[in-house]
């Protein structure tokens, strides 16, 4: 207590709603309206979040180990974001997690879930999936991002990311599709949507695999988690994929790619994790992905839901708060969000 006269009179009453400007972090309404950008995306339909992987990396815990959960979510709010996905260093108690986020005006929008449908008994994945659904429901999320991790090379340090990827057999395709449809039904029954994350080093990486996947799964139960960075790294035109599947997309990752670093990764046969360390990925506006047509597709489709900045890189090289602010400014200037 400071004991300064009049200090308490300036504070909002307990439970009072913060003024809109105060909740906007670094981006007051006047600043966001400036810059000559168009109000392309509707704030009433689209929420803007950022992933914690820019602060601490779940696959390489030494990257950002100095960044606490409290620092991470405080900086997200300060940079002007509305929500976050769940990171490995977040509290496992949904009550504790939700309270910490409520204090900062943040919400949980999604969490990564690793399925092993083609290499392990279905029941094993289902049990883990149900536990995850229960947790996400408790913290108010409506999406669960699933990636099939059977035979994934993304975490193998000596495996070149553009080589040796597992290609599914017909039987494996059937197991994957059948299993995901079952999981999608479980999610639907709980008021949630299963969004599948195509990803480097996994069984759904290439354009052909994405197309076959989308042609095979039940469109009422399994949706797409679109990731601009993973499309670009895989040599796919992200505009083409998003335009084709925007009506079936229920979660979006905005990830940029540094083309020269990605080309070096291919030339020198880097693993996925080395590529992350060396800076293949970055925030929107800092790399070579053209986001203008992606924003236009999102706007024209009437998409409703979350778009999330996700850019895993070494926080010692790319200060997380600095890059969060950079991404937030870029998106504000180009979309009006």
Question: Where does each model-flagged region fall?
Answer:
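Active-site acidic/histidine proton-transfer and metal-coordination neighborhood
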Residues: 122-224
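Active-site mouth loops of central-metabolism enzymes
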Residues: 54-67, 116-125, 166-172, 283
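Active-site beta-loop-alpha junctions enriched in small/polar residues
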Residues: 53-55, 87-89, 113-117, 149-151, ...
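Short, Lys/Arg-enriched N-terminal segments with co-localized hydrophobic residues
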Residues: 26-39
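Short, flexible, mixed-charge acidic loops at enzyme active sites
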Residues: 62-67, 151-161, 261-274
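Acidic (Asp/Glu)-rich catalytic clusters
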Residues: 41-45, 74-78, 91-110, 128-141, ...
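Conserved, mostly hydrophobic/aromatic
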Residues: 50, 76, 84, 101, ...
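Acidic/histidine-rich catalytic cores of soluble enzymes
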Residues: 84, 177-288
């Amino acid at each position: 207590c400071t004991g300064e006269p009049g200090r308490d009179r300036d504070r909002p009453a307990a439970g009072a709603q913060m003024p809109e400007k105060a909740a906007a972090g670094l981006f007051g309404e006047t600043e966001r309206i400036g810059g000559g950008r168009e109000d392309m995306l509707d704030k009433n339909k689209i929420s803007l979040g950022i992933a914690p992987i820019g602060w601490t990396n779940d696959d390489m815990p030494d990257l950002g180990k100095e960044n606490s959960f409290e620092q991470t979510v405080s900086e997200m709010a300060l940079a002007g974001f509305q929500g976050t996905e769940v990171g490995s260093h977040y509290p496992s108690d949904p009550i504790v997690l939700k309270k910490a986020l409520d204090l900062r005006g943040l919400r949980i929008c999604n969490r990564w879930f690793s399925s092993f449908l083609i290499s392990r008994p279905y029941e094993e994945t289902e049990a883990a999936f149900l536990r995850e659904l229960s947790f996400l429901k408790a913290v108010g999320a409506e999406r669960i991002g699933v990636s099939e991790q059977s035979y994934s090379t993304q975490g193998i340090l000596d495996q070149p990311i553009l080589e040796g990827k597992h290609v599914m057999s017909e039987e494996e395709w059937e197991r994957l599709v059948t299993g995901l449809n079952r999981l999608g039904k479980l999610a639907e029954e709980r008021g949630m949507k299963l969004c599948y994350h195509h990803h480097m080093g996994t069984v759904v990486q290439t354009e052909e695999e994405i197309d076959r996947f989308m042609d095979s799964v039940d469109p009422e139960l399994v949706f797409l988690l679109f990731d601009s960075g993973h499309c670009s790294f895989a040599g796919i035109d992200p505009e083409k994929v998003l335009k084709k599947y925007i009506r079936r997309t229920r979660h979006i990752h905005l990830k940029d790619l540094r083309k020269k670093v990605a080309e070096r990764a291919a030339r020198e046969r880097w693993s996925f994790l080395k590529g992350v360390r060396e800076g293949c990925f970055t925030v929107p506006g800092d790399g070579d992905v053209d986001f203008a047509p992606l924003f236009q597709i999102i706007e024209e489709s009437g998409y409703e839901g979350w778009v999330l900045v996700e850019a895993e890189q070494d926080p010692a090289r790319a200060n997380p708060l600095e890059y969060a602010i950079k991404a937030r400014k870029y998106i504000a200037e180009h979309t009006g969000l």
